[in-house]
């Protein structure tokens, strides 16, 4: 009995001053929980406030306030303590599953955000790498590209592959051609990087195909024989009425005859003088002729001419070229005509 009295004292609220002999009654049950495998209920005591609420075992309340406990069970739609415990276990499992779902969802969202950040991050790095590569290209272009012997050997091995004994010579020639093409491509790339933009006159000049061999052949001086040719004998027929001395001297060498005055049929005399050689001097020279199509799709021919005195270059049409130096244009065309 002493144990029960101490137990009741522990679960009952402290009595106020002047109310030590009061009887404590359960007004209502507010909540429930399970602690140490024991179902306890939160009790509101009659005549006391919320500060005086206590948690009491369900078994003890069944002894002194079974009606209040039954009303609480009815409110929860359960019949007894076992159903209430099962309901609590279901709620606990449900809460755990919801928490696990929330955790998995947050983890998946975090991973997706991380993946998206990574996917967006990769192009930046690639752009940076491209920019760095662009910045490094001028330095690398200045360095001459000289393939090493090991690189050439490996390149030969990859190109040639397994070759039959009969085709060994052919394979060696193919390797040599590929190596030559490779070196030519590298040299052409270096030249393309160093070449400056051409002007309009230079563009027209690049289209013109000047036949230098024909011009050089035309300008070559005529080679004369080292030994002078023998003078030919010229027979001059004269009238028989003339003196015999003159008829006897009718055969005269050509070298002596140049200094003698020749008599024509009408009695006049003339001297035989060497022909005058006119020098072919032109101020302008024609470098070439190229086809040109303008914006209106009109096809014309442009002529590239150079002033031999000043070095000035002009790109003109046919009429203007003729006005500048007609003989230079005619000479250019005659050198290229074949009859």
Swiss-Prot record:
Biological processes, Gene Ontology terms: heterochromatin formation; negative regulation of gene expression
Chain positions covered by the region annotation Disordered: 1-21, 91-199, 215-272
Basic and acidic residues biased stretches: 106-117, 171-183, 230-241
Keyword terms: Chromosome, DNA-binding, Nucleus
Acidic residues bias (residue ranges): 184-193
Record carries keyword Nucleus: yes
Chromo domain residues: 24-84
Single GO cellular component term: nucleus
Keyword Metal-binding set for record: no
Phenotype caused by lack of the gene: Expression of unc-4 in all 6 VC motor neurons in contrast to wild-type expression which is only detected in the vulval VC neurons, leading to hyperinhibition of HSN neuron activity and egg-laying defects. RNAi-mediated knockdown in an spr-5 mutant background suppresses progressive sterility and prevents accumulation of histone H3 'Lys-4' dimethylation.
UniProt tissue specificity: Expressed in every cell of the embryo (at protein level). In adults, expressed predominantly in the head region and the germline.
Biased composition (Low complexity): 242-251
Compartment annotation: Chromosome; Nucleus
SMART domains linked to this entry: CHROMO
Domain of life: Eukaryota
Matches recorded under SUPFAM superfamilies: Chromo domain-like
Job description of the protein: Specifically recognizes and binds methylated 'Lys-9' of histone H3 (H3K9me), with highest preference for trimethylated 'Lys-9' (H3K9me3) followed by dimethylated 'Lys-9' (H3K9me2) followed by monomethylated 'Lys-9' (H3K9me1). Plays a role in maintaining correct unc-4 expression in the VC motor neurons where unc-4 is expressed in the vulval but not in the non-vulval VC neurons.
Protein name: Chromo domain-containing protein cec-3
Organism: Caenorhabditis elegans
């Amino acid at each position: 009995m002493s144990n029960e009295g101490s137990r009741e004292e522990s679960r009952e609220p402290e009595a106020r001053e002047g109310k030590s002999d009061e009887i404590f009654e359960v007004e209502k049950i507010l909540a429930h929980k399970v602690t140490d495998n024991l179902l306890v209920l939160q009790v509101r005591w009659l005549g006391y406030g919320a500060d005086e609420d206590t948690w009491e075992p369900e078994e003890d309340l069944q002894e002194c306030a079974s009606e209040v406990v039954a009303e609480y069970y009815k409110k929860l739609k359960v019949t007894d303590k076992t159903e209430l415990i099962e309901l609590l276990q279901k709620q606990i499992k449900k809460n755990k599953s919801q928490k696990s779902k929330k955790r998995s969802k947050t983890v998946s969202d975090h991973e997706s955000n991380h993946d998206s950040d990574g996917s967006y991050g990769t192009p930046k790095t690639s752009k940076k790498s491209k920019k760095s590569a662009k910045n490094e290209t001028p330095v690398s272009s200045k360095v001459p590209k000289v393939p090493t012997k090991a690189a050439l050997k490996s390149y030969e091995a990859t190109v040639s592959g397994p070759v039959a004994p009969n085709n060994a010579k052919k394979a060696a020639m193919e390797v040599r051609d590929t190596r030559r093409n490779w070196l030519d491509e590298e040299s052409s790339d270096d030249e393309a990087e160093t070449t400056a933009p051409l002007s309009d006159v230079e563009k027209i000049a690049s289209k013109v195909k000047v036949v230098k061999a024909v011009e050089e052949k035309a300008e070559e001086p005529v080679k004369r024989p080292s030994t002078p040719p023998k003078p030919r004998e010229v027979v001059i027929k004269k009238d028989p009425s003339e003196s015999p001395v003159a008829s006897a001297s009718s055969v005269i060498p050509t070298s002596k005859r140049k200094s003698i005055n020749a008599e024509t049929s009408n009695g006049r005399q003339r001297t035989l003088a060497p022909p005058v050689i006119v020098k072919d001097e032109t101020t302008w020279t024609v470098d070439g002729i190229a086809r040109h199509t303008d914006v209106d799709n009109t096809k014309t021919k442009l002529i590239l001419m150079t002033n031999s005195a000043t070095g000035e270059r002009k790109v003109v049409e046919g009429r203007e070229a003729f006005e500048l130096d007609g003989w230079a244009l005619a000479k250019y065309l005659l050198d290229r005509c074949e009859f």
